[in-house]
């Protein structure tokens, strides 16, 4: 359990204004009460659990009741020990009651019955997840915490009332800070703009989870934060999305982005959201290189090529066309081609190739046992003899082998005839182009095919684990039968609860719990009830298949900006998504940029319009009178030193200089890795070297619009 003896707050030096007692004194007091209640509850539960374990076991119903109580106490104790003060997600303040209501992963009261934490799943907690500036649901403000190793390392306040900003300035989140900056002198135009922002965001957050919702918006429109709030709200409001129904998967473009997501989306423990990049979905993703040949990348980006995986697997699922004599210790049995075909048909539809082997093998043994007409041999002895028949095993393994996904996909790139058979629509030149010397020199473009192959094949170790598991179960049942025999012998009437242990269902449930296979499930394999995809304009048709395979319900929140697509995006969202396999598509647009100053957007807009004349560039409504600065690369360090000295808070980013090393307050990124992130100061190094055509223009546009305060462009010439 996390420590409860220290202050809940551990704010870094640059967030010193947030440590003002006027902002956090009430929290400190409340967290002290939570800590005291947690320690008391844990001590009481531990004592009760010890007492139950030491109490006489009893017999019959008494024994069962005792076991149930031990199970209940253990579960509650485990839940409380799993977290410390970070049980608390945040608090909300009602417009008509200044007393904060703290929302937690679990409900918690003190010894007097005073509520310390409101369970996040209760109806009373809905405003914490559902309130927006357009529909505050009766809230005056909401505070979210960022927990790091059990202590608060940052927090943000959202203020929903026009007179509630006083005293919150140091802790306001971006949108609340923007609204506060407008002050009381809002023009009619600004009031209209603000109303548009609030109404659009509210509609997106509250839109139902059925089908695909596209949130289209340019830089600074708040689309990512809106999507994150939507995730939290859907998880709260839609019971179909709980983790026992599949849960929510949030897919981001890269790891720096996922770190940002962790700051915004509240962690909801077991009911939470899985976050990942596309690379994380495939074991080979971490080491995969970028495909250097654009034509190879284009061919592999097609969803059509992913379909080649099915015939590639079926190639290894052909029953023998010749019969064979199977020799046993008792007699010879003829196994005909028709018998092989019947066994192969026994695989249940949808069963992965490697996992279907057991079904086919069992059917094959059944056919052979049925054809044996010698009554002298028992089925068990005959079965053991068949299992030792090397020729039978060899023929079966050749007809339906265990296959690794990496071997299957690697063969496509090194055996031209195999690729031609599986993808007959490819031309001879295209087949030749896709061949390579190293079968498993994986690139990012290979990942969708590896993913599809792994799903279609299943785990090659699954059959082995399953056989070991069955052997363990048999041994456990045999041991349990001996125990039951002893219990019945000691039971006076031989009836009641003890004899119930003879029941197969009860034995199965008890044995399954004690001998479950020791494998960690793939948390990203799905299926998921809902998937959120950010920077979705970058996904290829093949990459979309990776996500569709994980979401049978086709329930998506799709966040993106066509103008930021590095490889171009000339069609509409509707056309793109229908082509990859989605239907029931709704589009929501965010057109107002309330974060990026007009001065920066004025410089960035011509850059993207030169390559994409119809780019959807958002309207920037904020000016800070700081012009875009141009200079020489030699000025980089002096510019950063001057900015750091003048700004105690904030983060800067240098984009385009791989030799610059990241520091505590200055990041160093490529244009591609800066996507989706924001910084107070952005310094571009030789942006003209970012590339040519649409890709270069998009990289320059994205890099320029990462700045929320100041943009500096430095060149070598």
What are these model-predicted stretches?
Residues 1-194, 199-202:
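Extended, charged low-complexity regulatory segments
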Residues 250-251, 386, 443, 590, ...:
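Active-site-adjacent beta-strand anchor residues
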Residues 92, 309, 453, 600, ...:
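A residue-level signal for conserved active-site and pocket-lining positions in enzyme catalytic cores
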Residues 197, 453, 536:
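Conserved hydrophobic/aromatic pocket- or pore-lining residues that grip, position, or stack substrates
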Residues 208-211, 217, 239, 243-249, ...:
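Conserved ATP-dependent motor core of P-loop NTPases, especially the RecA-like helicase ATPase domain
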Residues 2-45, 52, 167, 173, ...:
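P-loop NTPase Walker
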